[in-house]
């Protein structure tokens, strides 16, 4: 929670839409504790969060920060934004330099409006992001970023501000976190991602056997993920 406030401060009176399951650490931290600890106004969806309901809530509530899984962004962008240019005329206009910039600015404005127009950035995590949608968002300069984490890390491991974020990545090691790839040649040979920091769990509750399988004697958490 402290890191959330460091990377993207939320102020008293700001609005946050809580739509992630609070039984998961991503939802509990980003959709509840993050805003609650800053005195923000939290809005809980009372119906199943379909893309239509979520888009409507964004429009009415105008949240300051949005945290969500990739599927939500993908469905909203594919339904409300991409169809506007996913045709022969749209693709032709995108090849024309001056018109290209105008279309991108217009698409960015419309995409921002769909999500309430008042947010600093959208933090996406929890699953792989659709490459087509990501290319489009980067092309129009939309403020999104993709973070990487897991429950055992409470949950953040990697993050980068959207202005420095590189497409296809999930940010860089968060402050006070150490991250490395167990490989003889990390740039060319995949290896397991391991991390170490003050936010790493102490261990699994009453399950020492499972704990020693993921936490080594030097405090490195073995994520089981490859990079």
Question: What spans do the regions from the language model cover?
Answer:
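Conserved AMP-binding/adenylation subdomain of ANL enzymes
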Residues: 2-15, 22-109
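Short, structured coil segments at secondary-structure junctions
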Residues: 38-39, 61, 139-141, 175
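Active-site glycine/GP-rich loop and adjacent strand/helix microenvironment
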Residues: 126-128, 132-134, 138-139, 157-161, ...
């Amino acid at each position: 929670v402290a890191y959330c406030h460091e990377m993207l401060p939320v102020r008293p009176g700001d609005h946050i839409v809580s739509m992630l399951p609070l039984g998961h650490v991503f939802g509990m931290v980003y959709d509840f504790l993050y805003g609650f600890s800053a005195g923000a106004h939290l809005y809980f969806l009372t119906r199943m969060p379909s893309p239509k309901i979520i888009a409507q809530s964004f429009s009415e509530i105008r949240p300051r920060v949005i945290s969500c899984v990739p599927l939500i962004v993908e469905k909203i962008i594919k339904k409300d934004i991409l169809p506007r240019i996913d045709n022969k005329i749209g693709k032709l206009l995108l090849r024309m330099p001056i018109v290209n910039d105008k279309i991108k600015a217009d698409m960015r404005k419309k995409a921002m409006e769909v999500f309430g127009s008042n947010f600093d950035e959208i933090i996406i995590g929890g699953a792989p992001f659709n490459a087509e949608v990501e290319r489009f968002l980067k092309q129009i300069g939309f403020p999104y970023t993709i973070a990487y984490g897991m429950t055992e890390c409470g949950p953040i491991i990697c993050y980068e501000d959207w202005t420095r974020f590189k497409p296809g990545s999930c940010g860089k090691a968060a402050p006070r976190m150490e991250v490395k790839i167990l490989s003889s040649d990390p740039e060319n040979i995949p290896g397991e991602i391991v991390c170490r920091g003050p936010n790493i769990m102490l261990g699994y509750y009453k399950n020492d056997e499972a704990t020693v399988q993921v936490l080594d004697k030097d405090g490195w958490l073995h994520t089981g993920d490859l990079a």
